[in-house]
Amino acid sequence: MTEGVLWPELNGDVPRWQDLRVSLSSGRPSTNPPTFGTFRNGLEMWSFSASQVQNLYFEAQMPHGWVLGSEIRPHIHWSPGNSTNTGAVMWELEYSWANVNDPFPASTIINSTQAAAGVAYQQQLMPWTPISGTGKRESSVFVCNLSRVGNNAADTFTGVAFGISVDFHYQVLTGGSIEEFPA
């Protein structure tokens, strides 16, 4: 095998994008959780109400191969289920991000709206504002709260919105860190 053909990112010259994926089926319900119910046929996912704020909690740890200090681009994959409504859904991400051996700072809230495509069961991807990675290191951890803000005037989608996953796009130049536990 020619070096750099199978793993061209190991050349370290051109940043590549990777996904840090969080499956919402593993999210922890809050005191006002969405309903885990039928999405399509025998498939189930979390369905978020159109009339209230419902949320799930999760965590995510930055990989060792991440380009330190580069921005992180969070987004959600979601679906309108069987609805053909074209109203907008407001998704909110509250997070606190800390390095190993650092205290978690006060949380930050970012939100965004996206119109449903009007196509039943379509998978949609909605980005949030990028998050600065300045000062963050490998193994830093996000503690997160995902909400659909169904009671907000900007949320005009009248059906339930199904949450599939939250992803954080990040850049890599290598396959990982040299140290197992980077300082």
Q: Where would I find each of the regions flagged by the language model?
A:
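Extracellular carbohydrate recognition and processing domains
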Residues: 101-135
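Cysteine-clustered segments with highest specificity for TGF-beta superfamily mature ligands
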Residues: 128-131, 135-153
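N-terminal leader/pro-regions and domain N-caps
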Residues: 1-52
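Short beta-strands within extracellular/lumenal beta-sheet-rich domains
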Residues: 50-65
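Short amphipathic, basic-aromatic surface patches that mediate peripheral association
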Residues: 62, 78-82, 150-153
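A short beta-strand element within beta-rich, extracytoplasmic domains
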Residues: 69-80
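Extended low-complexity, serine/threonine- and proline-enriched intrinsically disordered segments
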Residues: 87-101, 166
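Proprotein-processing/basic-patch segments
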Residues: 149-183
